[in-house]
């Protein structure tokens, strides 16, 4: 039997999972690390914390599985996307804490770029919008704010990497400075049509080319780990950003297949095949994966509040003590009430992209109580997913010819109530997989594919296992009434926006 180690480096913790060659899990290790908030809207990580927690969990998972380095056929890496690290090419010392994807410190830089009219060019080349979320403006901030950084970068003394790239550099003992196309596509510097770093974008954002890593396929030879780390060298054969890795772990290899991951927020990706689809509905166009030099593209939409709406019920209102209570409580709601929660606690994500809005409840009556609030909170996740679903169908020209298949993962999918309501509102089946560790599985698959122990994508897809399919059971009239009410609630909230 062969084994693959998947490194899943997330925003709040690092995880390592050992998969057997039959895709079953042999061991899991997890370690949380500190978050740093030095100013309002700023979020940072210590690069050494990212590295030490990754190394510790990798060692623990291998030991827990009763294995040694020579038993591991390959390592796959998946990571929090867009987070930026700059480090010294010789010493490996980071010049600053990592700036995390959630960080908003470059808002003014982004506003200036927009006001100067650069967004159409950036969107055309990268598929992204100008937003502090992405890596490019974070790199510029570090070069300009850390004393001497820009001069050092111009002299070729510094390296940039997203978290995957930084971990790869550390794992290989500083021998390999590389990333994959999915991570590169989130930087604002990578042309998703040519598959290259773009000179015009580098000049626009004032980023020296010498900082940037080599861009490889998602399943490729990324070198080997330093033999001193695990008691022997292990080949590193796969890399993908976390949402793309989940898309792969869900075996969404065919155009029209969509995965939606429900955690604190929600990220949905729709495979659109070999041609990038331009969005007219404020979705992102991104690279789903790159295999054998061939890029597969996706439309991506993000929802800021999904599971955090349930956390609000628990921590903010105190009407539940555990997330699992939400569905049964929602079941007790008064069916004659139409309460809508628009959970814009930190603004609305796709397809609205309005950071200024704040949450609101609509349809309250004297009889509205905890059950109705639980009902509204869970339904809000389904309504927001419907908005993404509708935007993707509108953007993708083949939507009428192909049935979109939705596969879900993440902690919130444990709620049967929510998944059934999602199927009802979409009027489409919702598939929950047997293996919930889809992000790590995607990284493991990419590594195992390159190492020759996992099959080609189609065969892997054939082996994908369904745990439960939720089928729509709501009447068309009820669905239409509910969606009309949601649209009215969103319009009502949008009307409160007075601009910046």
Swiss-Prot record:
Glycerol binds at residues 81-82, 133, 242-243. This is Glycerol kinase. GO terms for biological process: glycerol catabolic process; glycerol metabolic process; glycerol-3-phosphate metabolic process. Pathway: Polyol metabolism; glycerol degradation via glycerol kinase pathway; sn-glycerol 3-phosphate from glycerol: step 1/1. Inhibited by fructose 1,6-bisphosphate (FBP). Its EC number is 2.7.1.30. One of its GO terms (cellular component) is cytosol. One of its GO terms (molecular function) is ATP binding. Sn-glycerol 3-phosphate binds at residues 11, 81-82, 133, 242. The gene is glpK. Key enzyme in the regulation of glycerol uptake and metabolism. Catalyzes the phosphorylation of glycerol to yield sn-glycerol 3-phosphate. ATP binds at residues 11-13, 264, 307, 311, 411. HAMAP family: Glycerol_kin (MF_00186). ADP binds at residues 11, 15, 264, 307, 411. It holds the Pfam family FGGY_N. Keywords: ATP-binding, Glycerol metabolism, Kinase, Nucleotide-binding, Transferase. Belongs to the FGGY kinase family. It catalyses: glycerol + ATP = sn-glycerol 3-phosphate + ADP + H(+). SUPFAM superfamilies: Actin-like ATPase domain. Gene3D superfamilies: 3.30.420.40. Signal peptide: none annotated. CDD domains: FGGY_EcGK_like.
């Amino acid at each position: 039997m062969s084994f693959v180690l998947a490194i899943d480096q997330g925003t709040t913790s690092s995880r390592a999972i050992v998969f057997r060659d039959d895709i079953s899990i042999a061991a899991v290790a997890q370690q949380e690390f500190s978050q740093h908030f030095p100013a309002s809207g700023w979020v940072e990580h210590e690069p050494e914390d990212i590295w030490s927690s990754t190394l510790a969990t990798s060692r623990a998972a291998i030991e827990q599985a009763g294995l040694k380095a020579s038993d591991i056929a390959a390592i796959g890496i998946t990571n929090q996307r867009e987070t930026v690290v700059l480090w010294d090419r010789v010493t490996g010392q980071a010049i600053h804490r990592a700036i995390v994807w959630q960080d908003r410190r470059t808002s003014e830089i982004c506003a200036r770029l927009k006001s100067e009219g650069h967004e159409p060019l950036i969107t055309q080349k990268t598929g992204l919008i100008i937003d502090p979320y992405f890596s490019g403006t974070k790199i510029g901030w570090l070069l300009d704010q850390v004393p001497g950084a820009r001069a050092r970068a111009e002299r070729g003394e510094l390296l940039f990497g997203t978290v995957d790239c930084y971990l790869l550099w550390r794992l290989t003992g500083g021998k390999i400075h590389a990333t994959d196309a999915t991570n590169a596509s989130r930087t604002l510097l990578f042309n998703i049509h040519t598959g290259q770093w773009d000179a015009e974008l580098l000049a626009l954002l004032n980023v020296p080319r010498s900082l940037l890593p080599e861009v490889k396929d998602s399943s490729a030879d990324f070198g080997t780990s330093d033999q001193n780390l695990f008691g022997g060298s292990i080949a590193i054969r796969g890399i993908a950003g976390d949402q793309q890795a989940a898309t792969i772990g869900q075996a969404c290899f065919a155009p029209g297949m969509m995965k939606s991951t429900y955690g604190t927020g929600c990220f949905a990706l729709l495979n659109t095949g070999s041609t990038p689809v331009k969005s007219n509905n404020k979705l992102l166009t991104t690279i789903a994966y790159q295999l054998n030099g061939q890029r597969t593209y996706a439309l991506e939409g993000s929802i800021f509040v999904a599971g955090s709406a349930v956390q609000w019920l628990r921590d903010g209102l105190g009407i539940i003590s555990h997330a699992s209570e939400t569905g049964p409580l929602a079941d007790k709601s008064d069916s004659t009430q139409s309460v809508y929660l628009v959970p814009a606690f930190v603004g609305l994500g796709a397809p609205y992209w309005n950071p200024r809005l704040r949450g609101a409840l609509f349809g309250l009556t004297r009889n509205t109580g905890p059950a109705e609030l639980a009902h509204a909170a869970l339904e809000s996740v389904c309504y927001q997913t419907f908005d993404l679903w509708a935007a993707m169908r509108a953007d993708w020209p083949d939507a009428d010819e192909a049935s979109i298949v939705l596969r879900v993962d993440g902690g919130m999918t444990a709620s049967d109530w929510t998944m059934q309501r999602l199927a009802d509102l979409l009027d489409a089946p919702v598939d929950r997989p047997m293996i919930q560790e889809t992000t790590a599985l995607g990284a493991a698959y990419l590594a195992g594919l390159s190492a020759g122990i996992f099959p080609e994508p189609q065969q892997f897809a054939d082996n994908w296992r369904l745990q439960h399919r939720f089928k729509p059971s709501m009447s068309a009239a009820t669905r239409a009434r509910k969606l009309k009410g949601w649209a009215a609630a969103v319009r009502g909230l949008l009307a409160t926006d007075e601009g910046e």
